[in-house]
């Protein structure tokens, strides 16, 4: 076969390297599936824990700022250190979650979506199409002030306006017994508006209907605000575009939406408040079969900046085997899709049809290989259960090699 004419990519992408087993497969993906085919300017940031520690986590902030500059980032899974990791790596500090830091700088909404393979059975067999879930990653319980109340007394909520104006006081509860618990949480109009814009942009790009779920019957003002802002944003900027694409936006009660989700066939974008999104994204991942088949894209309110990553962790258990020189069978599909989703966005921004075609062929190669029966151990286990034996699966590198061979065949077809 003649040497492949590399596809030129006009603008750079930001690459964020990561940790452990995912760092190992990341390099392999880059060397075998990306660099042989693309002429690409990569702005590289090492978000591996040792370098984050060395730079006092500045590298994480720099990588997020570069993302705002270049509009496309592709991220490998990273360790968020706990006490044990601080000891293991001899860290200067227990650094925060890089994903949290990046999310706060980009002010984005996280969208998760499963990768479907016909031969991998789903726990919810009715889900024949993907469901893309968007989680509002700001405020509510995650930025709340919660406290234990000891003894009797009044709990009040007070708002003191800046400058002129009267302060407002609400009596929340009168504790008469031995006390209890309390919680005060908030969100901002700006953040809800950004969430609405990102959700609508994602739905339009996919040409899928959009549902927002809240409990506005109980939280009439709090959740009512989400409902109202979404409706305003929809009417102002998206309604005509949605109608032209034959899709729609609808608000649903969270309990109705969960029931609908379970009996639906899929094929829509589900916008969730922070806590609901935290819970329901794991419900979807399990229902579709595997976190190893879950993509995650952070979409910014500017409509042009995204960061793509795998929805899973750094696969420490496999890395320990790899460190000892043992054979691993780690699923690289979600990490490959981080590259394809990021590059597909680059292609759309640059109007690069060849690059877009390449990303579609790489995704099809991954799915094609699995559907032809070549897969890693985690997927083979879903298929074969207790009857699983070594001939049913490929090891980490064999799988990436199989995808590379399939990709080359599709590109030369």
Curated annotation (Swiss-Prot):
Question: What does the record note about the cofactor?
Answer: Binds 1 Mg(2+) or Mn(2+) ion per subunit.
A single GO BP term for this record reads: isocitrate metabolic process
Q: Name one GO cellular component term.
A: mitochondrion
**NCBIfam families linked to this entry:** nadp_idh_euk (TIGR00127), PRK08299.1 (NF006156)
Please state what the protein is called. Answer: Isocitrate dehydrogenase [NADP]
Entry binding sites for substrate: 80, 97-103, 112, 135, 215
Tissue expression notes: Leaves, nodules and roots with the relative amount of 1:3.4:7.7.
In chain numbering, the residues marked as site (Critical for catalysis) are 142, 215
Per the record, the similarity remark reads:
Belongs to the isocitrate and isopropylmalate dehydrogenases family.
Pfam families recorded: Iso_dh
Q: What is its EC number?
A: 1.1.1.42
Which principal EC class is assigned to this enzyme? Answer: oxidoreductase
Q: Main role? A: May supply 2-oxoglutarate for amino acid biosynthesis and ammonia assimilation via the glutamine synthetase/glutamate synthase (GS/GOGAT) pathway.
Q: Which Gene3D superfamilies match?
A: Isopropylmalate Dehydrogenase
